[in-house]
Amino acid sequence: QMCIRDSNNEAGVRMEFYEDGDEIVSIWKPRPEYQGWIDTLHGGIQAVLLDEICAWVVLRKLQTTGVTSKMETRYRKSVDTKDSHVVLRAAIKEIKRNIVIIEAKLYNKDNEVCTEAVCTYFTFSQEKAKSEMHFLYCDVEPEEILPLI
């Protein structure tokens, strides 16, 4: 089996992931139900998006599973829920044994950095991921079908 997100979850954020060199990328459409203030994407939703893309860095780049042990988030600019899309990008910054530091950024439709996160992930060995979490491998969408914006 490969990594699968549950697109049938009505409450889910429904992200899709692509590989772009060392980065994992997601292009996501804000929805009005995720606003915290009028036409403003809730900060908690932004944190969910950033945490999720960091998890996919672990899944895809390291081919294992892990859990978030710490997340530092910096909100720089509000995100408009009426925007056509936002872009999230994340990559590994550092690996210390089973601890992985991942940097992620959320950009608005004008390619301005709105939110940044540094996630610290505790990762499991591939053996444990396979035996206890039933994780075999993770594919992302091919880079050649990365949507053009």
Where do the PLM segments sit?
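Short, small-residue-biased leader/transition segments that mark boundaries at the very start
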Residues: 2-4
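Short amphipathic beta-strand and strand-loop transition segments with alternating hydrophobic
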Residues: 15-18, 92
